[in-house]
Amino acid sequence: MKNKKISIGVLIVTFLFNLFGFNVIAQEQIKGTISLSGAWALYPMAVKWAEEFRKLNPGVRIDISAGGAGKGITDALTNMVDMGMVSREIYPEEIKKGAYPVAVTKDAVVAVVNASNPALDAIMSKGLKREAGNNIWITGMYKTWAQAFGSKGSIPIHVYTRSDACGAAEVWAKYYGKKQEDLLGSGVYGDPGLALAVKKDPLGIGFNNIGYAYDSKTKKQIAGLRVVPLDINGDGKITTDENFYDTMDKLIEAIATGKFPSPPARELYLVTNGKPQKEVVKKFLLWILTDGQKFVNEAGYISLSKESINKEIEKLK
């Protein structure tokens, strides 16, 4: 009789486990593959999100490759990847082709020079006027550092831009009312490549996403580079209200509060071909917009507002 009671008890426990335990675990487990390609700007953040998501869902494989926003949108629309990483606004013609953007975070593009630039004192104290930037990258009228920043001598400016179709160049050009193809300079592939080109050239000037101008661990400017402050009010000097470039944290706060202009601040997107149908992709996107947001600031990005996040979540329902 005693053994019979034990057997019945085991059966009941097994039944309850199968009913309430195993099924719940099975429901919570997520499996599948997710592929992303595109913007260098979003690449470090996407890698961090993938790492954290896989800790919770080891059955999910996430493949990520960088190559510029242009590649990301093309790969997404041709179903080469599940999602394209895009660091610019989505064009109307891309929307017509099926592009379905979900904003996931914000960052910005900044001008950079070599830390050994002979005109560095003038650059840092006077800042980059919008007119000066326009005459460096758009018209090409400014050929020397003296013309651009009022320093002495006739030392030439070596101008760099991006060779790949990318959000950083598109947003930097938009700051001057133009498009990427209007930017002048020696073309360099990728964010890391452009940063390296300026680091190697004491007379070089370029632009980078903030994740490549600052060290995400120390929050300081990358060794060998200096971020050029924008003379936002155009008074020929960097005032206290415009001086927020020493650390990544200060710049992020300036972007979040609107002190830093937009553009060159902008939202970053994950884009699918049509509204996402693949379950693992939808779950990853929803996680990014909820629990995944806690990793945004530590990775050197800016969180979206609660209103914006709720709007993006609604797009996935």
Where are these regions (language model features)?
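Basic/polar N-terminal segments that are highly enriched at the extreme N-terminus
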Residues: M1, F22-Q27
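Bacterial N-terminal signal peptides that target proteins for export
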Residues: M1-I12
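Bacterial N-terminal signal peptides
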Residues: V10-G21
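Flexible loop/hinge segments at secondary-structure junctions
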Residues: A26-K317
